[in-house]
């Protein structure tokens, strides 16, 4: 029983290296070959619409039973009848849960039995090339034509209820399709980046080997030589000068005012005495009549007396109205009524028409008043 155990381990270790197209006849894989021979029957079942893609759990359980059947055939206990029974059990487990009529099931079993191939010569389990199997399911896409094992070949009964999740996890079933197997299981190694031609940014590697020399600087304390120092602006020319302010002596001497002379000759009349007390004020009457002369000869006519007071204004009564005569003799008599109320209320004849047609104006009072007014106005004007 140790040999089947060892072969089962080899299958588990090399499950990732199996190819889909490489199917070889090896010892203990007659059940896989039987399944390959039944490809036509499975395709016919798919065309009829009966088969469906199995679930991952069904396929995993089928591979577990397949591994057990292979181990039994190794021991020599397997026969044609047992192989047939194992094939029936595998197809029942690997097929989906869809129901099918019993007639089709019998036809699939009948076609599967004559398609069996004779067992291949046994090979030692320690051979360099691990056994390969193309009948793996669980990860293949349902639409790929090269994966017949992914779809059910014959209708089968529902999967057995007793399943071991631990054994399912142990058996590895990579996908059948070559594209999915290469992309998922065999990931290409990522090439390492070429770091020889990598350049740093902003030329930082140009001074990569530079070592700062700050630590090599020595600070030496030297005394300053001030012998050749020259002062600014010639201040050193009088460096030995000693101020003489300390030797000055302040001597107090009285001021001699005997020879002092006053300004502006004020001392020349210092002995002068004012003689204002001896002045006498005399009052004399001035004779303006004899000595004083008027300006512009105004005194020449000082004795003139205007003669305006001797003038007389004479008034003469004009009688030209009374003496006036009309140019034409119209034969009417002019009656003059005096404004003075008198006893005689009869109208008075102002004029009499002469034979020549002239009017006698001797007795007209209006003309007399007019003459008086004219003479009065002339008297006012001084004529």
Curated annotation (Swiss-Prot):
According to the UniProt entry, which residues carry N6-methyllysine? 201
The protein's superkingdom reads: Eukaryota
Which positions does the record annotate as the modified residue Omega-N-methylarginine? 97, 291
UniProt keywords, alphabetically: Acetylation, Cell membrane, Cell projection, Cytoplasm, Cytoskeleton, Disulfide bond, Isopeptide bond, Membrane, Methylation, Microtubule, Phosphoprotein, Repeat, Ubl conjugation
Q: Which residues carry this modification: Phosphotyrosine?
A: 18, 29, 139, 336
For this chain, the site of the Glycyl lysine isopeptide (Lys-Gly) (interchain with G-Cter in ubiquitin) cross-link is 44, 196, 201, 209, 223, 240, 253, 259, 263, 273, 285, 289, 295, 311, 317, 327
Name by which UniProt lists this protein: Microtubule-associated protein tau
UniProt organism field? Papio hamadryas
């Amino acid at each position: 029983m140790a040999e089947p155990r060892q072969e089962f381990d080899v299958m588990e270790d090399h499950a990732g290296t199996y190819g889909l197209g490489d199917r070889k006849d090896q010892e203990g894989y007659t059940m896989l070959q039987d399944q390959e021979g039944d490809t036509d029957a499975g395709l016919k079942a798919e065309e009829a619409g009966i088969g469906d893609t199995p679930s991952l759990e069904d396929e995993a359980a089928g591979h577990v039973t397949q591994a057990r059947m292979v181990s039994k055939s190794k021991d020599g206990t397997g026969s044609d009848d047992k192989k047939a029974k194992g094939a029936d059990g595998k197809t029942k487990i690997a097929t989906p849960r869809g129901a099918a009529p019993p007639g089709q099931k019998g036809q699939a079993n009948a076609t599967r039995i004559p398609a069996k191939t004779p067992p291949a010569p046994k090979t030692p389990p320690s051979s360099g090339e691990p056994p390969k199997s193309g009948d793996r399911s669980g990860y293949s896409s349902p639409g790929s034509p090269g994966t017949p094992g992914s779809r059910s070949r014959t209708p089968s009964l529902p999967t057995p209820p007793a399943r071991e999740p631990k054994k399912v996890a142990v058996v590895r079933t990579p996908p059948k399709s070559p594209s999915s197997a290469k992309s998922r299981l065999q990931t290409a190694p990522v090439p390492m980046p070429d770091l020889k031609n990598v350049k740093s940014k902003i030329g930082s590697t140009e001074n990569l080997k530079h070592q700062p020399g700050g630590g090599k600087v020595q600070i030496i304390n030297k005394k300053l030589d001030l012998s050749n120092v020259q002062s600014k602006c010639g201040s050193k020319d009088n460096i030995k000068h000693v101020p003489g302010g300390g030797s000055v002596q302040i001597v107090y001497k009285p001021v001699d005012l005997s020879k002092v002379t006053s300004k502006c000759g004020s001392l020349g009349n210092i002995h002068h005495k004012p003689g204002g007390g001896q002045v006498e004020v005399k009052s004399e009457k001035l004779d303006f009549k004899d000595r004083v002369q008027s300006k512009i000869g105004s005194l020449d006519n000082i004795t003139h007396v205007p003669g305006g007071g001797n003038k007389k204004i004479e008034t003469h009564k004009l009688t030209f109205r009374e003496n006036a005569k009309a140019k034409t003799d119209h034969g009417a008599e002019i009656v003059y009524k005096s404004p003075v109320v008198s006893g005689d209320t009869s109208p008075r004849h102002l004029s009499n028409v002469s034979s020549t047609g002239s009017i006698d104006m001797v007795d007209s009072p209006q003309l007399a008043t007019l003459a008086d007014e004219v003479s009065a106005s002339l008297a006012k004007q001084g004529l």
